[in-house]
């Protein structure tokens, strides 16, 4: 595992290279992440850093969290996130400190996690891209029906995981190995190549990639 940042998706735009190539990028606003706790092997059994970001109304902060934030001397945030790290990492990290966009480098590969847009109840054509039935030739009732969902008496049930109509979206998803194209330290922005999960304004988690792509 590695240390990352909590950010907020701003939207998409494009940047141009010196050669004139257009690169679609997603803009992530990563304001300084305040360190609320540092976990150690001796006390917690593993090493991790817990961060918070943004603001939260005092009425929305529970008593236990008020004490937690007060102990670290940081303002309560809208989100808490924990990043585990190895034995050789995080030596300079201390509670009440901050993590900023300079944690990353241009050209680095990152993984981005977010909550996808909720689409509500959707049929199989929209949800799983089923082909659907004939538009005519005697078909008048099942243009967008899923068709058969299983066998008869053996096994006499529908298998788990069968692709059927249901809730679409609003789930946690991670996109791996995205390239970090540009970093704007002045405005605390990360420009990442390609699309990421979620709607503009949603919280995302940016971490160094856990897998390496061999070309």
From Swiss-Prot:
Query: Which Gene3D superfamilies does the record cross-reference, listed alphabetically?
Result: 3.30.160.810, Translation factors
Q: Where in the sequence is N5-methylglutamine found?
A: 153
Q: Name one GO molecular function term.
A: rRNA binding
GO CC terms on record?
A: cytosolic large ribosomal subunit
GO process terms (BP) = translation
Q: How does it assemble?
A: Part of the 50S ribosomal subunit. Forms a cluster with proteins L14 and L19.
Name under which the protein is recorded: Large ribosomal subunit protein uL3
């Amino acid at each position: 595992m590695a240390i990352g940042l909590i950010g907020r998706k701003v939207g998409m735009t494009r940047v141009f290279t010196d050669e004139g190539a257009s690169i679609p990028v997603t803009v992530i606003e990563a304001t300084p992440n305040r360190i609320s706790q540092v976990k150690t092997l001796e006390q917690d059994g593993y090493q991790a850093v817990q961060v918070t970001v943004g603001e939260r109304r005092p009425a929305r902060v529970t008593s236990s969290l008020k004490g937690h934030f007060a102990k670290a001397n940081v303002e309560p945030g809208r989100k808490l996130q924990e990043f585990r790290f190895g034995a050789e990492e995080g030596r300079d990290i201390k509670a009440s400190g901050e993590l900023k966009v300079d944690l990353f480098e241009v050209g680095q590969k990152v993984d981005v996690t977010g909550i996808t847009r909720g689409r509500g109840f959707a049929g199989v054509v929209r949800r799983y891209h089923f082909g659907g039935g004939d538009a005519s030739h005697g078909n008048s009732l099942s243009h967008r029906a899923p068709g058969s969902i299983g066998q008869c008496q053996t096994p006499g049930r529908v298998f788990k995981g069968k692709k059927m109509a249901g809730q679409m979206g609003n789930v946690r998803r991670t996109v791996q190995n995205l390239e970090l194209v540009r970093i704007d330290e002045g405005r605390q922005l990360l420009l990442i190549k390609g699309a990421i999960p979620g709607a503009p304004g949603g919280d995302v988690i940016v971490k160094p990639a856990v897998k390496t792509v061999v070309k």
